[in-house]
Amino acid sequence: MIGKLKGVIDEIAEDHAVIDVHGVGYVAFCSARTLGNLGGAGEAAILFIETYVREDMIRLYGFATQLEREWFRLLQNVQGVGAKVALAVLGTLSPSELANAIALRDIAMVSRAPGVGKKVAERIVTELKNKAPAFAGEASGTIGLKQELGAGAAPAPVADAVSALSNLGYSRDQAANAVAAALKETGEGADSAKLIRLGLKELSQ
């Protein structure tokens, strides 16, 4: 089994890269995010590999980090999610963004990925809400929110506030941290408008 490739980029295609390792070209299928960060032909590259072996083929999937590879494996535990859909999700959301979306039950965020409808997004959020932290860890903002909310799903005002702050240009982790700080001040009964206002105050400090 191949676990990692270290070589030179020979070609970048729409859904895969060819990595030359001592004269042998390996085709690795990657997410759009990973392909976009690889660089160009002739540049050095390292990919962490998930190897699929079937009777009629061997296919390699490549990832920029081991964390991304763990998410790829985890996503395919969800009914209706195969390798193609898992790559689409990882091409749309970074591991920290995906962790935040699952923690906040942000189905709309997950469904942004091509080929992921509302039902599949709901299954991803529901089936991975307890497994995801153990496999991949979480962004600090997600941890802060879980500490404030406990084990349950985030209420709609919390998810709306994080989404609104993200739409203003802040990262999902920054937004989640700010909303977690706002919750410390207001408690769980605050509406989204108040959480957004206090979140912006926190981010401006």
Curated annotation (Swiss-Prot):
Residues 1-64 are annotated as: Domain I. InterPro entries: DNA_helicase_Holl-junc_RuvA_I, Hlx-hairpin-Hlx_DNA-bd_motif, NA-bd_OB-fold, RuvA, RuvA_2-like, RuvA_C, RuvA_C_sf. Residues 65-143 are annotated as: Domain II. GO terms for molecular function: ATP binding; four-way junction DNA binding; four-way junction helicase activity. Residues 144-152 are annotated as: Flexible linker. It is found in: Cytoplasm. The keyword Lipid metabolism does not apply. It holds the Pfam family RuvA_C. Keywords: Cytoplasm, DNA damage, DNA recombination, DNA repair, DNA-binding. GO terms for cellular component: cytoplasm; Holliday junction helicase complex; Holliday junction resolvase complex. One of its GO terms (biological process) is DNA recombination. Residues 153-205 are annotated as: Domain III. The keyword Nucleotide-binding does not apply. Has three domains with a flexible linker between the domains II and III and assumes an 'L' shape. Domain III is highly mobile and contacts RuvB. Homotetramer. Forms an RuvA(8)-RuvB(12)-Holliday junction (HJ) complex. HJ DNA is sandwiched between 2 RuvA tetramers; dsDNA enters through RuvA and exits via RuvB. An RuvB hexamer assembles on each DNA strand where it exits the tetramer. Each RuvB hexamer is contacted by two RuvA subunits (via domain III) on 2 adjacent RuvB subunits; this complex drives branch migration. In the full resolvosome a probable DNA-RuvA(4)-RuvB(12)-RuvC(2) complex forms which resolves the HJ. NCBIfam families: ruvA. The RuvA-RuvB-RuvC complex processes Holliday junction (HJ) DNA during genetic recombination and DNA repair, while the RuvA-RuvB complex plays an important role in the rescue of blocked DNA replication forks via replication fork reversal (RFR). RuvA specifically binds to HJ cruciform DNA, conferring on it an open structure. The RuvB hexamer acts as an ATP-dependent pump, pulling dsDNA into and through the RuvAB complex. HJ branch migration allows RuvC to scan DNA until it finds its consensus sequence, where it cleaves and resolves the cruciform DNA. Belongs to the RuvA family. HAMAP family: DNA_HJ_migration_RuvA. This is Holliday junction branch migration complex subunit RuvA. It comes from Brucella canis (strain ATCC 23365 / NCTC 10854 / RM-666).
